[in-house]
Amino acid sequence: MTTTKNFLPEQYRQNNKLGINHNYLNQQFLDHEAIWSKMREVVINGDFTLGSEVDLLEKEYAQISETNHAIGVGSGTDAIFLSLKALGVGEGDEVITTAFTFYATIGAIVTAGAKPVFCDIKADYNIDPSGIEAKITPATKAILPVHWSGKPCDMGAIEEIAQKYNLAIVGDACHAISAFYKGRTAGSLGTLACFSFHPLKNLNVWGDGGIITTNSDELADKLRLMRNHGLVGRDECHIF
């Protein structure tokens, strides 16, 4: 039996005493043909944009996330940006988050036209809920917790604050695919959850990709329009 570990360079194997298969960008895939056959199928069918494979991914991802909807997008960055815009976040609004994150979290807030408001973190590098309430102003529209390294934030406390002040929660779950918080999947936490399929993530694609999960029918419908320029079929376009 061939293991993934055997494909790694000798120096990497020596440094990896526990045999943990960390993401290694030059690592060979175990089953080339399974991947290539699926890619050939897509090419032959000409199913390049939002086709049947994306539909299947969304269906299965919603199932594992235990949510009503999963909406595929171009990247984790797109997922955060589109989620904010779907909630109506824009010029003059504020979003509470943490500075301990990849730039895309903050970049999405700024690109949406809003102002990031930084809250301190705890020893686990996740946002400290005890500091959130003091950051809330009349301009606050959402809380954006980052589940750093896949460890979910203290969502019980965050959801309690969000409910008290009628705020949306957009979870940056780009590290948290298949993570759980008190029996709930990371995808089911908050108003919307955003995931990344970047090659460095624990579930990745060839290139880049992302997905948004939610239980809101209204937000899901809006996001499906927004990810594709508001197009409904070929002859109708919604302007946001």
Question: Residues of each region from the PLM?
Answer:
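Generic structural signal for small/hydrophobic residues in well-ordered secondary structure
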Residues: 24, 38-39, 61, 79, ...
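Structured loop/turn residues at beta-strand edges in well-structured enzyme cores
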Residues: 65, 90, 138, 187-188, ...
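Active-site phosphate/pyrophosphate- and oxyanion-stabilizing loops and adjacent acidic/basic residues
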Residues: 59, 156-159, 208
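Active-site region of PLP-dependent enzymes
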Residues: 5-7, 176-182, 189-240
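Conserved PLP-binding active-site segment in aminotransferase class I/II-type PLP enzymes
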Residues: 1-86, 90, 111, 163
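Conserved donor sugar-nucleotide recognition element shared by glycan-biosynthetic enzymes
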Residues: 50-54, 76-80, 102, 125, ...
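PLP-dependent aminotransferase-like
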Residues: 7, 85-173, 180
